[in-house]
UniProtKB/Swiss-Prot annotation:
Subunit relationships: Part of the photosystem II complex.
Keywords, sorted A to Z: Chloroplast, Membrane, Photosynthesis, Photosystem II, Plastid, Thylakoid
UniProt topology in membrane: Peripheral membrane protein
Main location: plastid
Name under which the protein is recorded: Photosystem II reaction center Psb28 protein
GO cellular component: chloroplast thylakoid membrane; photosystem II
GO BP terms in the entry: photosynthesis
Subcellular location(s) of the protein: Plastid, Chloroplast thylakoid membrane
Family: Belongs to the Psb28 family.
Highest taxon of the lineage: Eukaryota
Xref: Pfam families: Psb28 (PF03912)
Length: 115
């Protein structure tokens, strides 16, 4: 099962919008994951301490991909969204990310399409 976490051990329930860019030679690129009202904010508003957001972790049966490039957006002083940027450095990294995205979409009964 493919899952996304911001705090290790706690699955994010909000499904992100994922925007992909790719270099002309197809070897490098960027994946931007945007989460509106992610459930991780609900954890931080509770009285229990679940820990800090330390990155975004993409986990599936092949292992884990991660990025520390995670930012929170606030509206009127309240957390509203999280955006994470995952850099793809080579063709095998691109292929691996696409396998994760396809597994994640399948697990969530969604489909992937090119725009």
């Amino acid at each position: 099962m493919a899952k996304i976490q911001f705090i290790k051990g706690i699955d994010e329930q909000t499904v992100p919008e994922i925007r992909l860019t790719r270099s002309r030679d197809g070897n490098t690129g960027t994946a931007i994951f945007s989460f509106i009202n992610p459930t991780v904010f609900l954890l931080h508003s509770s009285s229990q301490n679940y820990g800090e957001i330390t990155g975004m972790y993409l986990q599936d049966d092949e292992g884990e991909l991660s990025t520390r490039n995670v930012t929170a957006n606030f509206v009127n002083g309240k957390p509203k969204a999280v955006e994470a940027v995952y850099l793809i450095r080579n063709k095998s990294g691109w292929d691996r990310l696409m396998r994760f995205i396809n597994k994640y979409a399948e697990d969530k009964n969604m489909s992937f399409y090119k725009s």
